[in-house]
């Protein structure tokens, strides 16, 4: 199996974006705008005065974190989680852009709208657990929904992921952090579609 690199992931994201704009992949107007905004943000990085930089390795970090977990239900149960192009596109936006001033992430709030049966809870659980454990920026993570039952779906998904995988993850992460060279770029580090809002709040 080919080793997945940061370059390969960004090429996947770029190809996905081009398919959205060409019409090869059907998408609503708002999603097309999101793709256009991503292209615009990337192009702006060429300007020396741009206050942001892009770290593809940070996107790879999240991808590798997701791969350490396995599907817990459905026909893929037991298989490692492989981010779809759409979810990789979200990750590339959320985790790739940083501020030159202090190395903090550019985007602090994320709005994700996705139809039912697209593993929303699983994806949000991956993001939430990623914010708590391996990132250099530690956060408190709050999960809110229209009802306690709805928000509990994400919470239970997090528990399911961790209880099934935590031992291996702790060992792998400890080894990885011990041997990984420091990165110079970062200075700190219902039938209808359901709407989720995530806010990452810096822990005191």
Where are these regions (language model features)?
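Phosphate/NTP-binding elements of NTP-utilizing enzymes
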Residues: 2-204
């Amino acid at each position: 199996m080919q080793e997945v690199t940061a370059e390969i992931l960004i090429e996947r994201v770029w190809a996905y974006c081009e398919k959205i704009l060409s019409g090869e992949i059907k998408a609503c107007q708002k999603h097309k705008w999101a793709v256009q905004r991503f292209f615009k943000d990337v192009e702006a990085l060429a300007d020396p005065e741009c206050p942001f930089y892009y770290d593809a390795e940070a996107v790879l970090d999240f991808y590798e974190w997701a791969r350490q977990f396995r599907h817990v239900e459905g026909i893929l149960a037991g298989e490692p989680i492989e981010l779809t192009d759409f979810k990789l596109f979200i990750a590339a936006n959320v985790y790739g852009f940083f501020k030159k001033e202090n190395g903090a992430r550019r985007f602090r709030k994320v709005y994700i709208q996705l139809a039912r049966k697209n593993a929303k809870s699983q994806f949000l659980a991956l993001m939430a657990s990623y914010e708590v454990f391996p990132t250099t920026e530690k956060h408190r993570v709050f999960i809110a929904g229209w009802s306690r039952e709805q928000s509990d779906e994400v919470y239970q998904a997090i528990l399911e992921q961790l209880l099934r995988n935590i031992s291996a993850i702790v060992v792998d992460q400890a080894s990885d952090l011990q041997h990984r060279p420091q990165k110079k770029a970062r200075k700190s580090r219902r039938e209808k579609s359901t709407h989720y809002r995530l806010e990452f709040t810096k822990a005191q």
